[in-house]
Amino acid sequence: MNTTDLVKLLPAGYEDACYEKKAITRKRTITNPLDLLRLILFYLSGNKSLIDVSQFALMSGIGKISDVGFMKRFLKSKEWIIWLSQHILPNPVLHYKKPRWLESYQVLAVDASDIVEKGAVKKLWHLHYALDLFTLTCSQFKITEQSTGESLKNFSLTKGCLVIADRAYGTIKSIEHCLAAGSDFIIRIKNKPFHIYDENGRKIVLSDWLRTIGNTAAQWKVYIKNSEKKLVPVRICACKKTEAEIAAEKIRIRKMESRKQRKLSDDTVFTHNYMFVITSLPSEISAEQILSCYRLRWQVELVFKRLKSLLGLGSIP
C-alpha cells in the first residue's frame, strides 16, 4: 500500500488529532502526522525492530531518527492511535451507543490465547487480554508462562469495571478478586463449577432450577461461599437456547464424546440446552439485559483473530 492509498483510509481530522493528542509536539525529523503513522505501521507490521524503523525512515525519505528517538515518539502516540482506532471503525460499530444502564461502567471482555516464542524451543506463553467493549480498544494485557491459567486475578480491576468472561473464569478465586476490587462481573459458568446455596446455607442444584424455567430469560438469587466460608449473594441468569443452537450443541457433544471416549451424564447434557451466567449486578438490571450484555463478549475473540492474522501475534519475537 502506498501513501496515497493510506490517506484514503484515514478518518477526517486525523492530522489535527495528532497535534491535539500531542503525538507531535516538535517538528524535528518527523514533521507531519502521515510520516509518523507510516513509521508506526511499519514497526507494527511483522516483528520489526527499532533499528529497522530507523533504517526505513532514512531510506523512505522521512529523515534520520535513532531507534530511541522513534520509541519516544511511539510512546507519545498512544492517545492518537486510540483515536485513529475508534474513528476508522465501520460506522455500525463506531456509532453504537452504550445502553443507559451501562453508562456508569467500563465494560471489559476478557480472554486469553496462546502465543509461541520463536526458535527451536518454541516455548508457549499465555496472552491475557482485556477489551473495552464500547471503544474496542485494549484496556490491559499481560503475558505469562503457559502454566498461568485463565483467571481474573491476571487483571487489575477497579470500581466501575464490569467484567465479562467465559466459563474458564468461573471460579471462586476469580469472583473474589473481582468483588475485592469493587468491580462487577458477568461470567458464564459450567454445570457444576462450585457449590451454590440458598439463603439458609443449604446446597442447591442448578439443573433442577433450569427445568423450571420456560422460554424467556429467568433469574435466580443464590449464594456462594468465599474462601472464608461466608455466604456471598449472587444471581444466576439463564435462557433456553434456540432449536438450531440446541441441535448444533448435540452434534458438538457427540463429537467431543467420540474424541475423548467419555460419555457426559444426562444431567450435564441437559444443561447444554441453556445459556447461564453468574453476576454480581443489582437486581434492577434484568436477566434479559445481563444475557444480552454477555453476548457482546465474542468481540474479544475477534480481536485475537485480527491480532494473529494481521499483526502476526502468533509468535513472540
Identify the residue ranges that each predicted region occupies.
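Single, function-defining residue in the core of a domain
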Residues: 1-47, 55, 64-65, 69-72, ...
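Short glycine- and basic-residue-enriched patches
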Residues: 95-99, 104-110
